[in-house]
Amino acid sequence: MAARLCCQLDPARDVLCLRPVGAESRGRPLPGPLGALPPASPSAVPSDHGAHLSLRGLPVCAFSSAGPCALRFTSARRMETTVNAHRNLPKVLHKRTLGLSAMSTTDLEAYFKDCVFNEWEELGEEIRLKVFVLGGCRHKLVCSPAPCNFFTSA
C-alpha cells in the first residue's frame, strides 16, 4: 500500500508541498482553504512523528516539523512559476541541487514517475504534476531501489 500524503499549496514559494499523513487520518486531507498553510510550530509535530508509518522512499527530512524539503512540486497546468514558465526543469537545478549534470530532464521525470508517483501517490500517477522543484534539500532518500542513492547533493 502506498504512503498517504497531504498536498498543500505554499503561495509564498508557488509550490505544492507533499506532507506525510498519520496512519490514523482518514481521507485525503487538504487543511484550510486552498493556498492556506497552517502556521509552522516546532512543537506541533513531535520529532518521531510518523515513525510508525511505512513510507518507503521518503527523505530523512520527511517527519521534521517543517515538513519534507525535497517533496515540492509545481503543476505546470495549475500555476505559473519561474521554473515551469520555461516548460522544463532547468539543467542548472540538476547540477546545483542534485549533482546530476549528465541526467536529462526526460530521464529525471521518468525516474520521479517510477519512484514518486508509483510508490508515494495514493491514487497512482498524476499526469498534471510534471514539473518538479527540488530546491535546497540536503537529505538522502531512504528508499529501496539503489538509484535513489544519487539524490545526495554535491
From Swiss-Prot:
One GO term of the cellular component aspect? host cell nucleus
Cell compartments where the protein resides: Host cytoplasm; Host nucleus; Host mitochondrion
Keyword match rRNA processing: no
Describe the PTM.
Answer: A fraction may be phosphorylated in insect cells and HepG2 cells, a human hepatoblastoma cell line. Phosphorylated in vitro by host protein kinase C or mitogen-activated protein kinase. N-acetylated in insect cells.
**UniProt KW Translocase keyword:** no
Please provide the record's keywords in A-Z order: Activation of host NF-kappa-B by virus, Activator, Apoptosis, Host cytoplasm, Host G2/M cell cycle arrest by virus, Host mitochondrion, Host nucleus, Host-virus interaction, Modulation of host cell cycle by virus, Transcription, Transcription regulation
- Top-level taxon in the UniProt lineage: Viruses
The record's InterPro entries line, in alphabetical order, gives: Transactivation_prot_X
Signal peptide range:
none
Biological-process GO terms, alphabetical = DNA-templated transcription; symbiont-mediated activation of host NF-kappaB cascade; symbiont-mediated arrest of host cell cycle during G2/M transition; viral genome replication
Q: Pfam families, from UniProt?
A: X (PF00739)
* Segments of this protein annotated with the region Mitochondrial targeting sequence: 68-117
Q: Which family is this protein grouped under?
A: Belongs to the orthohepadnavirus protein X family.
Protein's job: Multifunctional protein that plays a role in silencing host antiviral defenses and promoting viral transcription. Does not seem to be essential for HBV infection. May be directly involved in development of cirrhosis and liver cancer (hepatocellular carcinoma). Most of cytosolic activities involve modulation of cytosolic calcium. The effect on apoptosis is controversial depending on the cell types in which the studies have been conducted. May induce apoptosis by localizing in mitochondria and causing loss of mitochondrial membrane potential.
Share what the entry says about its subunit structure, partners included. Answer: May form homodimer. May interact with host CEBPA, CFLAR, CREB1, DDB1, E4F1, HBXIP, HSPD1/HSP60, NFKBIA, POLR2E and SMAD4. Interacts with host SMC5-SMC6 complex and induces its degradation. Interacts with host TRPC4AP; leading to prevent ubiquitination of TRPC4AP. Interacts with host PLSCR1; this interaction promotes ubiquitination and degradation of HBx and impairs HBx-mediated cell proliferation.
The protein, known as: Protein X
Organism source for this protein?
Hepatitis B virus genotype B1 subtype adw (isolate Japan/pJDW233/1988) (HBV-B)
Give me the gene this protein comes from. Answer: X
